[in-house]
Regions:
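N-terminal export/assembly segments and adjacent metallocofactor-ligating motifs
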Residues: 1-280, 285-286, 292
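Residues that mark the start of a beta-strand
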Residues: 140, 303-304
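Residue-level detector of intrinsically disordered, flexible termini
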Residues: 290-293, 304
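Acidic catalytic cores of enzymes that act on phosphate-bearing nucleotides/polynucleotides
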Residues: 304, 309-323
């Protein structure tokens, strides 16, 4: 047997390298067979895009869309040409719906107060609360949702409220048409949503109403407005826009007036006064002239005119627009 002096540096490095390589060889992942589906849906080809017709909600309204998916993952959204709210086109909100699915900051778990919780903890806490709510017939139980457009979800919420008759359901939308609905209730005695027929109009008076801008009906209203302008049918569609700041509607208006928000109500009252043959309220000279001209056009185009009021205006102004 060789002595210690025969154990040179090169041999020592060989033994050290072998000792390091052996544990590293066992760190690899075990061989696994990866398959896209255990039971593949009928008619689906892996890696091939498939389109589905669906509905995207915005502000309580549904917009028809066609969504392309690959292996069940949405990758592209298009407008549904058969749906009156999209007509084959999309807006920025529809495109953002796809991006939101892959947002790294999207919530992945429920929260309890300021801490991240788990779904198991949520289910356990909910089970206890529902048991206590049953004894009180739902008193103290509140459900907060956005505006629901799904018939299935509305039916499920209805079943929940039947089971807990003392529970309360609250609906909140950051941007909604609540003022417009309340205005229609004041004017007609019941809540209604106005759907203007722009394609048949000869005159539009928009008071802080950007119907060509972002909103649930942007695509349909913009398409109808463009088609009406392109039709060589007398009388030519005329658009008045009165607004406190710039908008797409104001940029396309024949007559645009920048007016302080506090004077919009007086302008609508001035139009109504001219139609009634009464003295209008005080307004700046430019606003007074526009109110007089708009009233004359409304009278000349009776039955073919539309008066729109923006969603952020009070219900009283919406009710006055219905009267006009």
């Amino acid at each position: 047997m060789n002595g210690p002096r025969d154990f040179d540096r090169r041999t020592a490095l060989k033994f050290l390298a072998g000792g390091i390589a052996l544990p590293l060889a066992g760190c690899g992942k075990p061989a696994e067979e990866i398959v896209p589906y255990v039971d593949m849906p009928e008619g689906l080809l892996p890696g091939e895009p498939m389109k589905f017709a669906t509905t995207l909600a915005l502000g309580g309204y549904g917009r028809g869309a066609l969504v392309s998916t690959i292996d069940g993952r949405p990758i592209k959204v298009e407008g549904n040409p058969r749906h009156p709210a999209s007509l084959g086109a999309t807006d920025v909100f529809a495109e953002a719906d796809i991006l939101s699915l892959y947002d790294p900051d999207r919530s992945q778990a429920p929260r309890h107060r300021d801490d991240v919780a788990t779904w198991d903890a949520f289910a356990l806490a909910l089970r206890g609360e529902m048991q206590r709510a049953t004894a009180r017939q739902g008193a103290g139980l509140a459900l907060l949702t956005e505006r629901v457009t799904s018939p299935t979800l509305r039916r499920q919420i209805g079943d929940l409220l039947k089971q807990y008759p003392q529970a309360r359901w609250y609906v909140h939308e950051p941007v909604s048409d609540d003022f417009a609905v309340r205005g229609s209730t004041m004017a007609f005695g019941r809540p209604l949503s106005a759907l203007p027929r722009i394609a048949d109009a000869a005159l539009i008076v928009a008071i802080d109403a950007d119907f060509l801008g972002a909103g649930p009906r942007q695509i349909a209203d913009a398409r109808a407005f463009a088609q009406r302008r392109q039709r060589a049918v007398a009388p030519f569609l005329r658009l008045y826009a009165v607004e406190p700041d710039w908008s797409l509607t104001g940029a396309n208006a024949d007559h645009r007036l920048a007016l302080h928000p506090g004077l919009l109500r007086n302008l609508a009252l001035a139009i109504a006064a001219h139609l009634q043959g009464e003295s209008p309220p005080d307004l700046p000279e430019g606003a007074a002239q526009l109110a007089k001209a708009a009233a004359a056009d409304l009278e000349a185009n009776h039955g073919r005119a539309i008066v729109m009021v923006g969603e952020r205006q009070p219900p009283e102004l919406h009710a006055l627009a219905h009267w006009l």
